[in-house]
């Protein structure tokens, strides 16, 4: 028996196995946080990368929506101006048939359309409406254009010019003098032209149904240049009115640039912008080539007399 080597001592005992298992378990626990941290970091990177395309997609959608809103605004303005031209045509037709006076007289009775609170209010309405009809003949002695300018009724002046647009020679004699009666001629003129310049170039072609309405705005601007008497100083224009006119001119130029540039503008479109800067001043971002393009495309020889009266360099 002593000749054989002991075999039991050469193999791991059962008491050594728990120590080995504990050592392996501790080693796993030390390695486990590193694995989890790596997985968390990789997840953050993946999430961050997935968010960026969605953010850019939202920006693209917002830009597309902005373009759609601007397109809708232009189309809405075109429709509104078209409706206004129809109203002007109807008023012109009624006036030629002697119906306008009756329509105006009916306006004095509009307060009676609302339900009266008591009998006293009804009697007061009737009392006021009767003498107002007697005042009409007194104001009718003054030319209509002068009366409208004195009241600074921009819509009324546009309608009056539209109704008589076929006789431009008469209007060019009447309107410049009538504008002097306005309390603030510069503000009145700016109110009259509105924001028609934001409409697309098709509204300024001869074939456009809005052509006559555009001519009204151009005639008002030209009349403003001819308003001051020669040698009697400059027209006073408040700084805030100049700022508003400059904003309009910049927006007008921007639209023309997106439609092919000033050198490709329609005649009426170029003339309108040229008259606007001649009336209220040339914005600082206008280049000399811009003015040359406007002069060339606007048929400036037809409005040379008005342009020479400008108090600004054009």
From Swiss-Prot:
Compositional bias annotation for Low complexity: 1-18
Molecular function via GO: protein heterodimerization activity; protein homodimerization activity
Primary localisation category: nucleus
Keyword field: Coiled coil, Developmental protein, Differentiation, Flowering, Nucleus
Compartments where located: Nucleus
Coiled-coil region(s): 67-97
One Pfam family named in its UniProt record: Frigida
GO biological process: cell differentiation; flower development; negative regulation of flower development; regulation of timing of transition from vegetative to reproductive phase; regulation of vegetative phase change; vegetative to reproductive phase transition of meristem
GO CC terms: nucleus
Annotated spans, Disordered: 1-31
Superkingdom classification of source: Eukaryota
Secretion signal span: none
PANTHER family the UniProt entry points to: FRIGIDA-LIKE PROTEIN 3-RELATED (PTHR31791), INACTIVE PROTEIN FRIGIDA (PTHR31791:SF49)
Family in the record: Belongs to the Frigida family.
Record's protein name: Inactive protein FRIGIDA
UniProt gene name: FRI
């Amino acid at each position: 028996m002593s000749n054989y080597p002991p075999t039991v001592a050469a193999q791991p005992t059962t008491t050594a196995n728990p120590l080995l298992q504990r050592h392996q378990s501790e080693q796993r626990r030390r390695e486990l946080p590193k694995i989890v941290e790596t997985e968390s970091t990789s997840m953050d990177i993946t999430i961050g990368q997935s968010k960026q395309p969605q953010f850019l997609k939202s920006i693209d959608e917002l830009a597309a929506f902005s373009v759609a809103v601007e397109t809708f605004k232009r189309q809405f303005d075109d429709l509104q101006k078209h409706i206004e031209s129809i109203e002007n045509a109807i008023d012109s037709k009624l006036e030629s048939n002697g119906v306008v006076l009756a329509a105006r007289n009916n306006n004095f009775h509009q307060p009676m359309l609302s339900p009266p609170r008591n009998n006293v209010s009804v009697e007061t309405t009737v009392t006021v409406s009767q003498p107002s009809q007697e005042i009409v003949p007194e104001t009718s002695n003054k030319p209509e254009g002068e009366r409208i300018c004195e009241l600074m009724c921009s819509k009324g002046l546009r309608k009056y010019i539209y109704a008589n647009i076929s006789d431009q020679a008469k209007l060019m004699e009447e309107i410049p003098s009538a504008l002097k009666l306005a309390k603030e001629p510069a503000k009145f003129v700016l109110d009259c032209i509105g924001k028609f310049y934001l409409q697309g170039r098709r509204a300024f072609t001869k074939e456009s149904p809005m052509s006559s309405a555009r001519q009204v705005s151009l005639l008002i601007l030209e009349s403003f240049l001819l308003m001051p008497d020669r040698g009697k100083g400059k027209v006073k224009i408040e700084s805030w009115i100049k700022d508003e006119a400059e904003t309009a001119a910049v927006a007008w130029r921007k639209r023309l640039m997106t439609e092919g540039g000033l050198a490709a503008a329609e005649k009426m479109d170029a003339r309108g912008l040229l008259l606007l800067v001649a009336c209220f001043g040339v914005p600082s971002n206008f280049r000399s080539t811009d003015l040359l393009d406007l002069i060339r495309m606007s048929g400036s020889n037809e409005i040379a007399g008005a342009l020479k009266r400008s108090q600004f360099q054009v």
